[in-house]
Amino acid sequence: MDLDQIVADAQQSFEQAADITTLENEKARFLGKSGALTELLKGLGKLDPEARKTEGARINVAKQQVEAALTARRQALADALLNQRLAAEAIDVTLPGRGAGAGSLHPVMRTWERVEQIFRSIGFDVADGPEIETDWYNFTSLNSPENHPARSMQDTFYVEGKDADGRQLLLRTHTSPMQVRYARMNRPPIKVIAPGRTYRVDSDATHSPMFNQVEGLWIDENISFADLKGVYTDFLKKFFERDDILVRFRPSYFPFTEPSAEIDMMFEHGKNAGKWLEISGSGQVHPTVIRNMGLDPERYIGFAFGSGLERLTMLRYGVQDLRLFFENDLRFLRQFA
């Protein structure tokens, strides 16, 4: 058979092969052990040396042309198969995308950070303390000695075991222990707030066994109730972002302050206009507490206040039931995102 005809037949056969299997079968017709080109190569031994050299060169050129056609068809079939697979896996970019769930701060944590930001802006430090506290720091150091009737004002979660000094452990009932802890590590003037979790045996629409509180303390040589009123009123106006806030101090009793006062506030406008809302406890730090801080009560004086972060959050956002903050209902929480 003429070499040119063999090459032409091979190229045509390869081009007509619809799949790899057919192509491999056609390859065997031309390049296999009994293929047309292979038979021609076997016959070279019958030729004289000069003719063998010339004919061998021609057969090799023809073989290269056939192999090139084979390679080209293999690539074409592979490309077609890939395109078919890609078409089956195609993504419709016109479909709306799936939105990723964006997280947000819990409303109480928003309040926590806002309180810190406001008090930092007026020169207060921020401190943190242990939630498992000793009864000495939680009660005794704050002028509530053992068997003092003030200890019955709140039910306490006591913890099994005692500290290294043999003192009873408990879940702190307020953040006030940080008054003494911080003052023992820092010298006056002391301006600090201590936000944190606290625990009491109480649960209803306005109380939770675990709640967040922020303690405020300012100790120096000439601090008065006027400073307390100025600081706290300024805080409320910044926190609620309004100037129509009236503040009053009602006489009260706390063992760690003397005199003591409940702080109430009232909006002049809006749905709560004309209503006095209890917001915080406060007072002038008791001399016994100042003494337990390691300071001289004849020289130093100051004020303290304690505010519930959930209470502030409820008033800011108009939430009526405290328990909603702890149920983790996304329908509720997304309102504050």
Swiss-Prot record:
Catalytic activity: tRNA(Phe) + L-phenylalanine + ATP = L-phenylalanyl-tRNA(Phe) + AMP + diphosphate + H(+)
Record note on cofactor: Binds 2 magnesium ions per tetramer.
Cofactor(s) annotated in UniProt: Mg(2+)
Keyword Nucleotide-binding: yes
Cellular component GO terms held in the UniProt record: cytoplasm
Keywords, comma-separated and alphabetical: Aminoacyl-tRNA synthetase, ATP-binding, Cytoplasm, Ligase, Magnesium, Metal-binding, Nucleotide-binding, Protein biosynthesis
Pfam families attached to this UniProt entry: Phe_tRNA-synt_N, tRNA-synt_2d
Subcellular location(s) of the protein: Cytoplasm
Domain of life: Bacteria
Enzyme Commission number, as recorded: 6.1.1.20
UniProt GO MF annotations: ATP binding; magnesium ion binding; phenylalanine-tRNA ligase activity; tRNA binding
InterPro entries: aa-tRNA-synth_II, aa-tRNA-synth_II/BPL/LPL, Phe-tRNA-synth_IIc_asu, Phe-tRNA_ligase_II_N, Phe_tRNA_ligase_alpha1_bac, Phenylalanyl-tRNA_Synthase, tRNA-bd_arm
Keyword Aminoacyl-tRNA synthetase: yes
List of residues binding Mg(2+): 258
Swiss-Prot/TrEMBL GO biological process terms: phenylalanyl-tRNA aminoacylation
EC category name: ligase
Gene3D superfamilies on file: Bira Bifunctional Protein, Domain 2 (3.30.930.10)
PROSITE patterns reported for this sequence: AA_TRNA_LIGASE_II
Assembly, per entry: Tetramer of two alpha and two beta subunits.
Family: Belongs to the class-II aminoacyl-tRNA synthetase family. Phe-tRNA synthetase alpha subunit type 1 subfamily.
Protein name in the entry: Phenylalanine--tRNA ligase alpha subunit
Organism: Burkholderia vietnamiensis (strain G4 / LMG 22486) (Burkholderia cepacia (strain R1808))
Gene name tied to this protein: pheS
